[in-house]
C-alpha cells in the first residue's frame, strides 16, 4: 500500500492488516540520489556538482519535477502542494475554513527551521484581525504531519534529556515547497537545515 498520507497505515488500516505489512518511508531525492538521477538521465559520469547543488537547493528533490522545464518547476510544485492540501488534509478532515488552514501552513513554510509554538501562530493570525484557538492550530499541524507534508522536531533539554513541549521546529518534506512559495535565497541557512533534517530522517534518525 502506498500513498502520501501516513494515516493509511496508522489508524484503522493498521489494525486491519496488523502483522501483514512492513512500513517503508519514502522521501524525495536526497542530493546523492539527485546526482545519480542526473547522471543516468544525461548518460554521463561527469557532472558539475556545484551547479547541481544550486539546482537542488532551488527546486528540491521531488522526483516528478525533475523532467519539468525550469520555468515550470515552481508551478508544478504548487500543484503538488494543492493536491496534498485538498486530498490529504481538507477532504480527509472535512475542513471548512480552508483559508485559515492555508494561512497556518503559510506561516509554517515561512518559518521552517525556526522555533515557534501554536501561541506564535495565534498572535500571527490575531495580527491579521482574525481569531483562532490553539487547539485548532494544533489539529491543523497534526493533519499536515499525518499527510507527511511537515515534520516536527521537538526541543530537548540537554542536561535533563527531557522533551520540551514549547517552541518546536517544523520542517518540510521537501524544501522546494518553500522556494516555490517565496523564491528567496536569503534564508539559505534554514533551507540547508531542512535538507539536513530530512536526510537524518532518511537515514533512520527520529
Task: Explain the meaning of each model-derived region.
Residues 1:
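Glycine/alanine-rich phosphate-binding loops at beta-alpha junctions
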Residues 4-6, 10-115:
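Interdomain motor-coupling "hinge/lid" segment immediately C-terminal to the ATP-binding subdomain
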Residues 70-206:
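Accessory nucleic acid-recognition modules appended to NTPase machines
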